[in-house]
Amino acid sequence: MDLRVRLIQDYYEGESIQALAGIYGVARKTIYKWLERHDAEGVAGLADRSRVPRHCPGKVSDEVVAHIVAARHRWHWGPRKLRVKLAAAHPSIAWPAESTIGEVLKRAGLTHRRKPRVRTPPYGQPFAAVDGANQTWCADFKGWFRTGDGTRCDPLTITDAHSRYLLRCHLTPKCDGTHVAAVFDACFREHGLPLVIHTDNGTPFASRAPGGLSRVSMEWVKLGIVAERSRPASPQDNGRHERMHSTLKQSTLKPPERNPRRQQDAFDRFQHEYNHERPHESLGDATPSACYRPSPRPMPRQVPELEYADDCEVRRVSQQGSVKMRGARTFVSEIFAYEWLGLRPLDERYFEVLYGPVRLGFLDAREHTFHRALHLALRRRLGLEEA
């Protein structure tokens, strides 16, 4: 039943019926059946129902089942190879089809279903227009490399999308949220706050949590910054930044410096040259420094708490990642532990779950379940825009 719940959630998150059929190994007709049961009965509708036929002339005999199970224990093969082996060893027995042998192995607990890959939720909003400085910053890690002494280096780079100004080119000791947040905080204090930060879907910028948020991007949301993400496997969405990486590599990494300190010195020299000396054709042969101005939005001394509209019920997330609603707890995600979420009622049963302006999903107050998305027919009934 857990797989069916996950299938339903994946469908609501945008997976097509055909893709789900391949991922979960079920027929499209079966998926439509589960969607109908879920709409009518909620999660309870996904439970197994009796499928015992009144008459089963093709039932596999206990003797055949015993042979199949014994063969599986001896050879860890799939149904096709097992059938060939069994037919050669016992030619007098009418062996069932490969699919039936597969079902016998499945019922005996001798198969392992491949788990579907959990992906970062897609960013469903159009990319922000860029026609001025600090409207969008782009950030990414330049691919790691080793300096002459064998030390691994992971340079974090941040640019202003409009002016191409290289705000940071910094070697971080680790690619985790703590070190990355420290680099961004220093950048915010020097240059002010952008309206949008565009990254890929990797850690620590994004995660598989609802809304695709991570600890780093959650702080951005509190600062009033939109955390914008590229489409999966689409580096062209951050093309300006990738072209800067190509120039950075040609200028500073062929070959790398002797040690990280010297490598950072090389990055600092490149940053100055890139910003103040190198003309950019896209800027009319001006330099980035001639086109960049600090943001009028200063970094506050303390990161503010999120605020919600009056029509939202505000709930604090427990350490275990759940919120209390109508006397029962519903799990959302542990990443939001101790954070305040807004629950905007859509009708008597469904609530939109918000982290500031970011939609995380929907809470079913009757079933006490959280869904990252809702079925199209239900969204239309609730008057929701396409998400």
Regions found by a protein language model. Give the residues of each.
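Basic, flexible linker segments flanking DNA-binding modules
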Residues: 43-138, 144, 214-217, 287-299
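A structural microfeature
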Residues: 167-168, 361
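Short, basic alpha-helical/linker "hinge" immediately adjacent to a nucleic-acid-recognition surface
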Residues: 1, 9, 17-73
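Mobile-element integrase/transposase regions
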Residues: 59, 99, 105-165, 173, ...
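C-terminal, beta-rich DNA-binding module of retroviral/retroelements integrases
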Residues: 271, 275-387
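Mobile genetic element proteins and their domesticated derivatives, centered on retroelements
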Residues: 7, 20-21, 31-34, 42, ...
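Acidic/histidine-rich, metal-coordinating catalytic segments
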Residues: 175, 188-209, 231-233, 238, ...
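Charged alpha-helix within mobile-element recombinases
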Residues: 209, 215-300, 342, 346-347
